[in-house]
Amino acid sequence: MKICAATGNAGKLRELRRILEAQGHEVVSQKELGITLEPEETGTTFAANALIKAETICKASGMATIADDSGLCVDALEGAPGVYSARYCGHHGDDEANNDKLLENMKDVPAGKRGAKFVSAVCFILPDGKHLTCMGECPGKVAFERLAGDYGFGYDPLFIPDECGVGKTGKRPNTEGRSYAQLTPDEKDAISHRGNALA
């Protein structure tokens, strides 16, 4: 099936495309279709924002559309940055500034209290309005410093996934305390919030 990916985020597009194409779908980005709309994320939940994005871009493209709204929820910050993850620093899409703010807000939080989870809501919608939203999570913790790697985007250098359990894919790589940014794309997809939502 040919699916429009409703995102302007290059990292998210890479992951959506990689996961969906492995399932046999053809993915075209909204940019490739000439759609420059950036739906306003006014929802208070990941699922509400995913639906807003999916509906808007589906109407503009006339195609089956998939949208993801995701973020990092930190226990010590009462779930923040949550739905505001992409604009935690005050403006949208500045990964460095968002990471800086998270590290600053976590500077006095001890190792045993740094629990967090990545959450993803993925909404698939057809031009007739029928839609389905699936949720995925990955538990872990916030690192004390950036654990940069060759992969990832957003908060990936600061998030260390837990070693326990398996994702919906049934696969579990040995993450060995590595951050999302240090995992290969296949390793991350096997356990990630987005991989779980799309499984």
Go through the PLM ranges and name each one.
Residues K2-C4, A10-A199:
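Anionic-ligand binding patches
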